[in-house]
Amino acid sequence: MARYLGPKLKLSRREGTDLFLKSGVRAIESKCRNRLDVAPGQHGARKPRLSDYGSQLREKQKVRRIYGILERQFRNYYTEANRLKGNTGENLLVLLEGRLDNVVYRMGFAATRAEARQLVSHKSIVVNGRVVNIPSYQVSVDDVVAVREKSKKQARIKASLELATQREKPTWLEVDATKMEGVFKRTPERSDLSADINEHLIVELYSK
């Protein structure tokens, strides 16, 4: 599947917020030289007033880039979220949070979601004792996600676990850093997730 391979900071500047595409070793503001709120390009300093559609599109692009998902797959997630009972926007975020690559990132086994996706694809992750190499695999409540035994010596995983101590720990996950494994304890609630995401704009966009 095609993936964006260009500068990660440019995407964060495009959306005007940290998309958590980098490891976090250095503050993103220092990398952008305090220009995070300035869009890339010659006319980046000019902030056009967005229409309702423009705001909806930007929000969708922001969330899609945070989770590293292409448009077609993102739309499929929306369709599934709309089919489920409850709030469509919240359902969408829950589905995205349940992706195996995202869970691996949240548990601290990878410094970024892109790195987590690579670990999964390279068969370094097991779910309930079985190797799963599909990044989009949906993790269920009580599933045990762990680093494969022969991958536990990887320096990048150890470094990621060290970095994870500086991040807020998700309350819906239980992680044993020493064993390099964790449990998906419960489905995250909206209050558990980023307040910087306005999922209602995405619902409005796709509802047209």
From Swiss-Prot:
PROSITE patterns found in the cross-reference section: RIBOSOMAL_S4 (PS00632), S4 (PS50889)
Description of how the protein assembles with itself and partners: Part of the 30S ribosomal subunit. Contacts protein S5. The interaction surface between S4 and S5 is involved in control of translational fidelity.
Family from the record: Belongs to the universal ribosomal protein uS4 family.
Species for this entry: Actinobacillus pleuropneumoniae serotype 5b (strain L20)
Listed GO MF terms: rRNA binding; structural constituent of ribosome
Function: One of the primary rRNA binding proteins, it binds directly to 16S rRNA where it nucleates assembly of the body of the 30S subunit.
InterPro entries: Ribosomal_uS4, Ribosomal_uS4_bac-type, Ribosomal_uS4_CS, Ribosomal_uS4_N, S4_RNA-bd, S4_RNA-bd_sf
Pfam families linked to this entry: Ribosomal_S4 (PF00163), S4 (PF01479)
Encoding gene (name): rpsD
Cellular component annotations (GO), alphabetically ordered: small ribosomal subunit
Keyword rRNA-binding: yes
Domain S4 RNA-binding: 98-158
Protein name, as recorded: Small ribosomal subunit protein uS4
GO biological process, one term: translation
Gene3D superfamilies referenced in this protein's UniProt entry, alphabetically: Ribosomal Protein S4 Delta 41, Chain A, domain 1, RNA-binding S4 domain
Keywords from the named record: Ribonucleoprotein, Ribosomal protein, RNA-binding, rRNA-binding
